[in-house]
Amino acid sequence: GQRNNLEIINIFTEAGKINENAPKHYVGLDRSEARKQILKELKDKEFFEKEENIKNKVPYGDRSNSIIEPFLTEQWFADAGKLSVKAKEVVNSKKTNFFPENWSKTYFQWMNNIEPWCISRQLWWGHQIPAWYGPDNKIFVAYNEDEAKQLANKHYGKDVELNRDPDVLDTWFSSGLWPFATLGWPDDKKFVEKFYPTSVLVTGFDIIFFWVARMIMFGTEFLNKEPFKDIYVHALVR
């Protein structure tokens, strides 16, 4: 679809039923029933060419054992490419070192091919995204609700009701803040100034990108300083 510049249209509700973007006689049908109806209509109108069995990998939920259906939704993304610039520089300049050194190749393999990072998750635990929506869905990103209300009041010229985004941050986003958030940042910088950066991080090779890279990205972005000098990478017990 994107190769042919087609519009991206979501036809499902969150319950897996057909929404109003589809022809009216399909709206409200379960996705499996809609497939049957569409197939019948193609045959009735003599647009159907052939039917054959094919092998396909169909994803199932590990708890529900239900088929996982691709579903288009709006999400929050971080510009990881921009965040990676300083993070690559501190390793290139040996301000931060990997031991064994060969693990830096894994680090750069990820960082040199980095893509926009989807940071929002539809879960019921985690740091809630600090964004509020006005009556016309205008977004106000703020430190807290009071600050969001002030921004909204200035924008609309009156008090309005705001609704907070229900999504939470990706757990690796929260984990990436760990080196300085645990020290009281951003409200209290006393311990940050005393204990940041630290000297050594010991971790497994499986989370070099998921955790190590994110800590370096956030440390260099928010504090302009790498969070640790040496990274000792160990194997895993499987």
Listing of model-derived features with the role each one plays in the protein:
Residues 17-33:
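A short-motif feature that recognizes glycine-rich, charge-decorated loops
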Residues 2-11, 50-238:
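Structured secondary-structure scaffolds
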Residues 30-58:
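Phosphate/diphosphate-binding loops
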Residues 16-17, 215:
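Surface-exposed, flexible loop/turn segments at secondary-structure boundaries
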Residues 16, 38, 61:
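Active-site cavity-forming subdomains of large catalytic enzyme subunits
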